[in-house]
């Protein structure tokens, strides 16, 4: 077991004081893994038993079809968690691959120890369960937004829908998106070159302005 982190800013631990981290993690159990960019944290069809919490770096949730085409469903970043969708169900088998998108350090905790009170009836278990329910609800919302984007027929419609969601989320028409061109193309499920051409057209037509991953809706 690795040294217990004193503070992890994950929403799973919302409402838990820094001094409570050590006894809490000692109770539920944990381990910390280090990964390099391109590593696989969990393969599709692998049974998931632990929740992963990203302490540094990021991980992509990726779906691959029979022809090897990969679609990035969502990027999980620092302090966010992954795997909870699968460990919560009756079937723990993952339907996606978790791919490390940059060097990462990940805290793993066993799901069953998070969701069930221990024999000592530690006070933080109820808080963990509340936080987990809230996290799953937020993840479902994010996936619904992704579905709204990719269901659009044209690249322009997908781009405008995605940028509109980002503007609403960040409460500004001037905002930064978390993707470069390659990642954005994967997220939108479109060809990168075609996406680049469409962005140029939209800028020339006065719909948007952008510099790298900084966008402004005009």
Task: Please give the residue ranges for each predicted region.
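Glycine- and acidic-residue-biased ligand/ion/polar-headgroup-sensing regions
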Residues: 38, 49-62, 78-79
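A small-molecule sensor/coupling module
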Residues: 112-154
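Short, small/polar residue-rich loop motifs at catalytic or cofactor-binding pockets
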Residues: 27-28, 46-48
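Short phosphate-coordinating micro-motif centered on Lys-Gly-acidic
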Residues: 40-46
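Phosphate-/nucleic-acid-contacting segments
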Residues: 153-155, 162-218
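Cyclic nucleotide-binding regulatory module and flanking cytosolic helices
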Residues: 1-37, 86-90
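Cyclic-nucleotide recognition modules
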Residues: 72-130
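A short beta-strand-loop-beta hairpin characteristic of the jelly-roll/cupin
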Residues: 59-71
